[in-house]
């Protein structure tokens, strides 16, 4: 398969880069537009990185490629492509490998031209394009050393502040560094004024991490001897210069005054106090009673690290016993006194009263001689404490929870009273409804226990006359029988006037004139007479049958004996169930 899109994009991007004119903004815009498309066309559909040993489907028209190591994994496309879902059709594509190498070479070429400087100076698109160029340059072989132009390119993006004494010629101070073999990638971050070396081994750079015997010597690269300097006298300008760069990386470094003495309290400005309040988690706890030592690390470069004490709050604190001036209590919340008894009428808002922000912004008055210091509190739990009516203390529980428990108890009592008045022990459905009304999740340890009611003993026989607690004999008089409504037969009915037509087997009684044969059978079932067959005369004797049905069954059975010839004609009885 021929990757047409990637090839066309490479040709167009190469033509624009080779014919680039620094004064042509249109060409610069086209390059910034084509480079991301070219990079996207060479991306793996599984991991999203630049293709390594690319493979592509053979019988497909789509432009989806994956790395050889990503074969068989799920692609990130939504919805998935139906052309390339079968990994058995993927084979190695040499043209894609050539295009990936061409992309790397193109990125290397851009870093050595004036186009790279224009990309860095551009504010709107510099980050995206620099990421693409860095992605392409990282795939270079480790044996090849990047050129010095990449280092100078990084210097233009974030210049290195000099820690030595200012010289008359600033270019002369940078010349030893530019001639050194130290090389920095374009996308590398600069922390504390010196670049990082992430992803490279320690052997690559000859950095001697300072020991306690030699705390201030830094040797970079064995082939170049850099002037050894004493940096302890120039620490304040280093911190002041790099403070702006460190804010973007989440590290907060405050400038120290030069006349700090052991045992004195550390002076903090208003801005530093506010900054420490906003970024408490990222602030390092520093103690000024120890001399700062300059240390160098491989991951972060040389940086200023002060010996710290692990405290409960990440703010700058003083170990001096004498505290003077206004104390800033906004960093640590005010803890309620444990031995003080409070009345129940006091509000919870009086427990913790934070210092108004206006006092911090305005700072101390003109008459105050001592600066703003931070009071060091003892390590006790800072959980808000609420008082119990008996004088003890418990962790703070909001008022809404306590009020809700009281309301739950009241609602539970009212609900139980209503359910007791409405409940009738004779009906099971109402008992179930009462149980559902009783809240199960509202019970607290101090709430009253649930009252259990015993079910009334069910009475045998018919429900007629027992629908109420006091049975009445006039229940079915002029009303529908409850047994009839439930389609049940009346057994041992105690009411008078009940005309329930349901039998014990669940069928209805039929009148004698409706279906004579079936009415006769129902009468037989009601009386419990076992007769295998009942003979009925033909249509000629239908009148006699009607008369017989009106008469008692015993007379009918006595009239028709087995000796009668009319019994030879058996009746065909049909039961419609």
From Swiss-Prot:
GO BP annotations, alphabetical order: DNA damage response; epigenetic regulation of gene expression; positive regulation of DNA-templated transcription; protein monoubiquitination
Gene Ontology terms for molecular function: histone H2B ubiquitin ligase activity; promoter-enhancer loop anchoring activity; ubiquitin protein ligase activity; zinc ion binding
Disruption phenotype: Perinatal lethality. Both male and female embryos show developmental defects ranging from mild to severe, including eye malformations hemorrhage, and brain and kidney defects. Defects are probably caused by defects in gene dosage and loss of biallelic expression of target genes: in mutant cells, one allele remains active, retaining active histone modifications and transcription factor-binding, whereas the other allele is silenced, exhibiting loss of promoter-enhancer contacts and the acquisition of DNA methylation.
Zinc finger extent (RING-type): 44-85
Chain residues that bind Zn(2+) 1: 44, 47, 67, 70
Stretch list, region Sufficient for interaction with MSL1: 1-116
Keywords, comma-separated and alphabetical: Chromatin regulator, Chromosome, DNA damage, Isopeptide bond, Metal-binding, Nucleus, Phosphoprotein, Transferase, Ubl conjugation, Ubl conjugation pathway, Zinc, Zinc-finger
Known EC number: 2.3.2.27
Chain spans, region Disordered: 405-428
Residues that coordinate or bind Zn(2+) 2: 62, 64, 81, 84
GO cellular component: chromatin; MSL complex; nucleus
Biased composition (Basic residues): 407-423
Pathway: Protein modification; protein ubiquitination
PANTHER family according to UniProt: E3 UBIQUITIN-PROTEIN LIGASE MSL2 (PTHR16048:SF3), MSL2-RELATED (PTHR16048)
UniProt record similarity statement: Belongs to the MSL2 family.
Protein's UniProt name: E3 ubiquitin-protein ligase MSL2
Organism, as annotated: Mus musculus (Mouse)
Gene that encodes it: Msl2
């Amino acid at each position: 398969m021929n990757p047409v899109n990637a090839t066309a994009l490479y040709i167009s991007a190469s033509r624009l880069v080779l014919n680039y004119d620094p004064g042509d903004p249109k060409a610069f815009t086209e390059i910034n537009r084509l480079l991301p498309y070219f990079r996207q066309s060479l991306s793996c559909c599984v991991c999203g990185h630049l293709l390594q040993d690319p493979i592509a489907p053979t019988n497909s028209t789509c432009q989806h490629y994956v790395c050889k190591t990503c074969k068989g994994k799920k692609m990130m496309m939504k919805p998935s492509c139906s052309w390339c879902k079968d990994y058995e059709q993927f084979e190695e594509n040499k043209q894609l490998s050539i295009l990936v190498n061409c992309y790397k070479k193109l990125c290397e070429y851009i870093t050595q031209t004036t186009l790279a400087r224009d990309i860095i100076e551009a504010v709107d698109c510099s980050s995206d394009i620099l990421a693409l160029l860095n992605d392409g340059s990282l795939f270079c072989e480790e044996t090849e050393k990047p050129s010095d132009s990449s280092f100078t390119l990084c210097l233009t993006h974030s210049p290195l502040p000099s820690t030595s004494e200012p010289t008359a010629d600033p270019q002369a101070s940078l010349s030893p560094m530019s001639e050194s073999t130290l090389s920095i990638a374009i996308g590398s971050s600069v922390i504390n004024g010196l670049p990082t070396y992430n992803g490279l081994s320690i052997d690559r750079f000859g950095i001697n991490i300072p020991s306690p015997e030699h705390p201030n010597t830094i040797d970079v690269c064995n082939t170049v001897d850099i002037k050894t300097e004493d940096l302890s006298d120039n620490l304040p300008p280093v911190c002041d210069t790099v403070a702006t760069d460190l804010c973007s990386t989440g590290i907060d470094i405050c400038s120290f005054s030069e006349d700090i003495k052991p045992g004195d309290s550390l002076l903090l400005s208003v801005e530093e106090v506010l900054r420490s309040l906003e970024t408490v988690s990222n602030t390092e706890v520093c103690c000024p009673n120890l001399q700062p030592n300059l240390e160098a690390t491989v991951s972060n470069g040389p940086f200023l690290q002060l010996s710290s004490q692990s405290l409960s709050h990440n703010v700058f604190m003083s170990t001096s016993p004498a505290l003077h001036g206004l104390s800033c209590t906004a960093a640590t919340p005010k803890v309620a006194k444990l031995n003080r008894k409070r009345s129940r009428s006091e509000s919870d808002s009086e427990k913790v009263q934070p210092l108004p922000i206006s006092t911090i912004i305005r700072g101390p008055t003109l008459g105050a001689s001592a600066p703003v210091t931070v009071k060091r509190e003892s390590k006790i739990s800072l959980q808000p404490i609420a008082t119990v009516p008996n004088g003890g203390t418990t962790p703070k529980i909001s008022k809404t929870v306590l009020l809700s428990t009281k309301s739950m108890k009241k609602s539970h009592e009212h609900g139980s009273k209503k359910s007791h008045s409405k409940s009738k022990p004779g009906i099971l459905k109402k008992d179930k409804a009462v149980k559902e009304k009783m809240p199960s999740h509202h019970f607290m340890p101090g709430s009253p226990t649930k009252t259990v009611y015993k079910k009334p003993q069910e009475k045998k026989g018919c429900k007629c006359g027992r629908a109420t607690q006091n049975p009445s004999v006039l229940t079915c008089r002029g009303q529908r029988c409850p047994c009839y409504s439930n389609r049940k037969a009346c057994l041992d009915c105690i009411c008078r006037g009940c005309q329930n037509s349901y039998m014990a087997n669940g069928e209805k009684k039929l009148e004698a004139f409706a279906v004579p044969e079936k009415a006769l059978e129902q009468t037989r079932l009601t009386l419990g007479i076992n007769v295998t067959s009942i003979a009925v005369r033909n249509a000629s004797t239908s009148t006699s049958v009607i008369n017989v049905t009106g008469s008692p069954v015993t007379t009918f059975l006595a009239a028709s004996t087995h000796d009668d010839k009319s019994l030879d004609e058996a009746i065909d009885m049909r039961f419609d169930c």
